[in-house]
Amino acid sequence: MKKSLFCGVCLCALVAMGGTSFADIMVGVGAPLTGSQAAFGEQIKRGVEAAVAEANAKGGMNGEQITLVYGDDAADSKQGISVANKFVGDGVKFVIGHFNSGVSIPTSDIYAENGVLMIAPGTTNPTFTERELWNTFRTCRRDDKQGIVAGKYMADNYKDGKVAILHDKTPYGQGLADETKKSLNENGMKETLYEGVNQGDKDFSALISKMKAAGITAVYWGGMHPEAGLLIRQMADQGLKAQFISGDGIVSNELASIAGDAVAGVMNTFGPDPRDDKANAELIKAFRDKGFEPEAYTFYAYAGVQSLVNAANAAGSNDPMEVATAMKEKGPFKTVLGDISFDAKGDPSLSPYVMFEWRKGEDGKYNYFQK
């Protein structure tokens, strides 16, 4: 990210938080703020900002106000490493981020070596916490749990059909596809096709022709919404009438913008929608009053800040290592996702994944609704 852009965004953050002092706690927000996955970055940014505003109004972390600085990783591991090094150089000690597993895993090593605690709102690859670094936490669920749900669902509902498992060759996408494949196989069904495509590809006509020739009746996609939307639309255009199923990488209304009416009936796994929790009604209204729909990772980022602040206050310290210990030992912490405790690895206690289906809501717009 260009220095001028970074400084400009930081200045906006300082103004938004009402100024800063040398005693303020600097929290970095690492996310894809530009590029094809910027919709998720915006969710994270909005969630963090709202949670920090609430925390600061209540006294911050042990009486110290929180100041936000931003790092645009553009969903790219190399850019993410640059962001991490920039955060370290600026004296950031806590990070809400990153989003993509392929960014969070390499940056976590940099943060661990430099005393920075990170809470990832969207990193679902099991490897992120399986290494048991002292500083890695997440407020989202894991792909091994997500794959179990998706694989069993397909084995139960398409056992007489043929399944294609596709992925985008990223740590998140291929990792999720592999976990889903494992579950599908363990539930007595073998996939007909297993193929990877490149993130950023736009023409899937050859792959769709191959799936038509193979008689595919269900397609599982391990990847993000930009490619998913194109796949869904092109499948419809080429007459492939197969059920499309994916994971939490497609939970953005941009999916419907890309896929059009072909998005109707698409299914995906995700955690129960926090927008359905009446306890969040006031917060949801506040977002909507500002013209922002708080989708998906808005709440996971918000919960990350809540967990951080509550753990620091419980520890009576803003030292990252002491806060990390408190996160594992002082829970549960009250959040917009419900009460969360963290295990020794940094994984949260959350309800299981569920299935969602895309259809038109009362407003006439496509959205994902729990089945």
From Swiss-Prot:
The lineage's top-level taxon is Bacteria
Q: Which CDD domains match?
A: PBP1_ABC_LIVBP-like
Q: Which InterPro entries match?
A: Leu-bd, Leu_Ile_Val-bd, Peripla_BP_I
Cleaved signal peptide residues: 1-23
Pfam families per record: Peripla_BP_6
A single Gene Ontology biological process assigned to it is: amino acid transport
Q: Give all cystine bridges in this chain.
A: none
| Sorted UniProt keywords | Amino-acid transport, Signal, Transport
What does the UniProt record say this protein does?
Component of an amino-acid transport system.
Recorded family membership: Belongs to the leucine-binding protein family.
What is the name of this protein? Leu/Ile/Val-binding protein homolog 2
Could you tell me which species this protein originates from? Answer: Brucella melitensis biotype 1 (strain ATCC 23456 / CCUG 17765 / NCTC 10094 / 16M)
